[in-house]
Amino acid sequence: DQAQLDKFTLIAERMKLQGDEKLLNLGCGFGYFESFLLSTYPDIQISSITHSKDQHEFLTTRMNDSSDPLSSDRFQLYFGELDSNTSTLLGKSKYDVVCSVGLVEQIKNIALFFEIINDLLIENGRTFHHLIVSRDRIPQFLDPEETLIGEYFPGGIILPFSEIKNYKFEHFEIDEAWFVNGINYWQTLNKWHANFWNNMHLIYPEQMDSKRVDHWNKYFVLCKAIFRPEDGQACGNGQYLFYKKS
């Protein structure tokens, strides 16, 4: 998918990858960012962690497929939560870069999250985060119980773009922050939503019952409603690059 490739290329550029780093991806999803990095940078070494059993099982299957980029000996997978034991599990002061794509929305204690990252990074290391943000502060988006967001992303919130950029972290200095217009997300989601209904005869009722169809339809409606207002200026992505203080 070209849109995903463009997204990953931009993220790699903005985190200033040289291609020989030891990189840790927090909350790795199903490993598609890792696949891109391993295929693009032949000397990069990647570690990734997930707390999802389904994702871990899927990734392990991929790692056992010799034709898959994740079968590389430059990739390591960990299973667990992000907590006080994380640096013991993953390696203290080990990584040149620590990143996350679509994770920070579910982090309840941002300061503690960055303390964990501080323990994982080498001196002068850097950390990059890509997340959904709003341009302005929207109170109901800060409480997962107030919108459908919490139903699909447990504990999930949408922070205003300036929140992380202006946060005074003890061990980090902001290098640069970018607001990415949300209209491209809306266009992609709109196509997925159309494909969902255009192919309904293939999935209903054999693979999905009416309850699951309703669940996923509401998901698409929710996401499209987030990114469409003001032609993508109301909500989009925030991208943040920090350097660890010396």
Predicted regions and their residues:
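Conserved SAM-binding motif I beta-strand of class I
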Residues: 45-50
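Conserved SAM-binding strand-loop segment of SAM-dependent methyltransferases
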Residues: 68-85
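A short SAM/SAH-binding and catalytic strip from SAM-dependent methyltransferases
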Residues: 97-109
